[in-house]
Amino acid sequence: MTDQLKRAISAAQTAQINDQQAEATRIASSSAGDQTFDMSESSYKTSHTAIRKARRFAMQGLYEWLVTDRRFDIDGKLGWKANAPHDIAARTRATNAMHTVHIGYYHEMMRDIPEQIDALNTLITQQLDREINKLDTVEHAILLIGAYELQNRLEIPYKVVLDEAMKLNNHFGATDAHKLINAVLDRMAVELRAPEIEADSKANLRTSQKAAAKPALKTDNSTNNNADIDTTTVAEKPTASNKPRISANNTSVKRNSASKALANISDYKASKQNDAQNMVEESIIKPASIEPVIADKANAFAASAENIVNHQPVEENVPASNDVNDNTTSLAEVELLDSNSVDVDIKGVDIKNIDVKEDASESVELNDADAKNQD
């Protein structure tokens, strides 16, 4: 047998002996109630989520311990105790991916809560209206974790402890169990965290007073603003100004000057005067257009009279000449009547023209007066 083979056999024998010794130590410690945890982890998660997951695994481990070894211990069946808390923790780590769990806090709860079980049960019983053995096992495990954190982990606020207990009950507890858990832990917090609760109540009182004072200040400011607005509206009256007004959309200066208003008024007057003159020119009939008509009529009557005289025979007697004279006189009278009627018509037209001119002048004067009043 070579030396290398001898060394391998001796190493296997020493390893077997070491395993036997470790098993014997484990059995002895579990029977004696001693718990040994490996707390040398330095790379486990320490965030709030990791601590929450540690609570969940601890609640499951405590539930398993309460229904096995703890029950056997109460019943006096010590020979049945074969499920120590450290064994539960070891199996949990071996069968679950716990790389996102706060391993140190998980092992701490699995070690300290079973060691302090009697003191924690006393705290819980003081706030219960029933015996603790009548509690559901899940509710009992949640209350143990909450009581442990309220008593030993003072760095965790009591509101966080109550909130995490409610979340554990939502995952594992009964429907209405949150009422009992919340009531027990709230009363327990009043006893164990009295300074914290007092400080929290004072802070809440200050915030409520500030919140109540803010609307009053706002109303006072609003009334002052309304008063300022009223005084400014009374004091400031709209007055005409010749200052340039600059538009926000256009950088050019817009001037509301008096010259622009006067120019608009003068244009309005000129347009009214032109309209009046056009009306007068359309309504007036010029005498020059009437005179050729009168002359034509007179020439026609004279020509007709000459024709009548020239065509009469010489041999006619005196009555014939009298008839001619009568005809000529009648023609002359007709001409006079026509001329008189034409003169009357011309005079009537002139009178109408004069009336139209007077109306036009009066309308122009009224427009001028209105424009002055507007200025």
UniProtKB/Swiss-Prot annotation:
Disulfide bonds: none annotated. Residues 25-44, 203-255 are annotated as: Disordered. Keywords: RNA-binding, Transcription, Transcription antitermination, Transcription regulation. GO terms for cellular component: cytosol. The keyword Cell membrane does not apply. Residues 219-255 have a biased composition (Polar residues). GO terms for molecular function: RNA binding. The keyword Cell membrane does not apply. GO terms for biological process: DNA-templated transcription termination; transcription antitermination. Belongs to the NusB family. Involved in transcription antitermination. Required for transcription of ribosomal RNA (rRNA) genes. Binds specifically to the boxA antiterminator sequence of the ribosomal RNA (rrn) operons. This is Transcription antitermination protein NusB. The lineage of its organism: Bacteria, Pseudomonadati, Pseudomonadota, Gammaproteobacteria, Moraxellales. The gene is nusB.
